[in-house]
Amino acid sequence: MRRVRIVSRHVSEAFEIESTSGSDEQRIVRLRVPLSSRFFEGHFDGMPMLPGVAQVVAIAHREAERVFGPLSAPTRMSRLKFQDVIKPGDALSLSLTRERGAETIVRFRIERLLAEGPRVASSGTIAYTNRES
């Protein structure tokens, strides 16, 4: 099996973390997408939207590592759903839930925080092999 290494350079400048709350296994991260995020370059002129890969890698995976500590490279991603467009300037809520067993599973849900109420933008599951002690 070929492993894919996720590189998240320039990610720290891509999203503004406003707050983090929750317990050891469940976290809520509030963040904002800057108007000038590099992720919108070429995606798409006249109607910028955050690419799905940025939602999974730059938001869900990176924030899982920040709040839960170092994780191994992801072994698989499943149940990925992209339900709404994330736009420049959007306020977001990221819910992360970690389950540990034979492998570590992180479930994520990204919601756009709109005046009329939250709307799910994306969700899914990322699996990681457990690090050997």
What is the predicted role of each segment?
Residues 31-33, 82, 128:
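Hydrophobic residues in beta-strands and at strand termini
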